[in-house]
Regions:
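Cytosolic-facing regulatory segments adjacent to core modules
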Residues: 79, 89-126, 130
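Conserved C-terminal guanine-recognition region of P-loop GTPase G domains, centered on the G4
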Residues: 158-171
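Well-ordered beta-strand positions
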Residues: 143, 178, 208-210
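Walker A/P-loop NTP-binding active-site region of P-loop NTPases
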Residues: 3-71, 120, 124-125
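Inter-motif core of Ras-like GTPase G domains
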Residues: 116-117, 131-152
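C-terminal boundary of histidine-terminating zinc-finger modules
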Residues: 220-249
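Conserved beta-strand segments of the P-loop GTPase G domain that flank and frequently precede/overlap
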Residues: 5-7, 33-34, 91-93, 122-125, ...
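Beta-strand-loop-alpha "switch" segments that mediate conformational coupling across diverse proteins
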Residues: 183-231
């Protein structure tokens, strides 16, 4: 189906929290994938189904061993785990040292995500850098979402990142780049409008899609420290974080079947199992 990539420039403001929130409210079956080259956080943030700890060895690391012999999209499901609350996840690498030996993986993994049977993929790619190997995964996306704070330094870094990323991706078939502003609820609309004005004035190939509320209490509940399973449908479901995630998710899900990777199956894809 479709691949939606979440990333940021310097500081990666709330990308993992946003990825979990978006996946949790996604209107179709979805897989949350940790693709941060610096290492993932889900193992430390959220409990597995049944209340135990997620297995850090089952995920991108175990999938890499499979991919050395060729990777079919349906094989991704063999390396996923399920969070308490029912969300399927592909746990990321544990540190940057592991990523250094797996730079070849991102291209076949991106193709597999784009052709994944039965679900969209929300991929947390963390902080992007110039010449990053994970750019090969981004090429397969339906949409790339870049998160920013509405401060001078964050928006300045964002402008530079959009320009360099567009140059790296190149071509008319490059995925569209959307911007999400992580903003204080008290200045929410004004912050989104101002970032949109700056991006438009700079004539950058990106569009501000909306905002994510800066909601520390909602983020704490979503992290597992606030008993996620017990509070889902209650305070967490009504939090500013989840409400803003729903606004973004609806529009993104419609885009997720129309991007560059959505029309291209991974080589050798076989009809595989539906999400568990």
């Amino acid at each position: 189906m479709g691949l939606v990539v979440l990333a940021a420039d310097k500081g990666a403001p709330g990308v993992t929290t946003a990825a979990v929130a978006l996946a949790a409210v996604w209107p179709r079956p979805v897989l949350l994938a940790e693709c941060d080259q610096a290492g993932g956080d889900l193992v430390y943030r959220l409990p597995a189904e049944g209340g135990g700890m997620l297995n850090p060895a089952r995920g991108v690391l175990s999938l890499a061993a499979t991919a050395r012999r060729g990777l079919r999209a349906d094989q991704v499901w063999e390396h996923t785990q399920r969070l308490v609350g029912g969300l399927d996840v592909l746990v990321g690498l544990t540190n940057a040292e592991q990523a250094q030996g797996l730079t070849w993986l991102w291209s076949p993994l991106g193709r597999a995500f784009a052709g994944l049977p039965g679900a969209d993929v929300v991929a947390d790619c963390g902080r992007l850098g110039a010449g990053s190997a994970v750019t090969d995964l981004l090429r397969e996306a339906s949409t790339i979402l870049l998160f920013t704070r509405p401060t001078l330094e964050h928006v300045a870094h964002l402008r530079e990142r959009i320009g360099s990323l567009a140059a790296e991706l190149g071509g008319h078939a490059a995925p569209p780049i959307g911007i999400v502003v992580v903003a204080d609820p008290r200045e929410y609309r004004a912050s989104i409008t101002e970032v949109g004005r700056i991006i438009s004035h700079a004539k950058l190939p990106a569009t501000v899609l909306g905002g994510f509320a800066l909601d520390p209490k909602g983020a704490e509940m979503l992290s597992g420290r606030g008993a996620w399973q017990a509070q889902w449908g209650g305070r967490l479901d009504r939090s500013l974080l989840i409400r803003s995630a729903r606004q973004i998710a609806g529009g993104l899900a419609a885009r997720a079947t129309s991007g560059p990777g959505a029309d291209r199956d991974a080589q050798g894809v076989a009809s595989g199992p539906q999400p568990r």
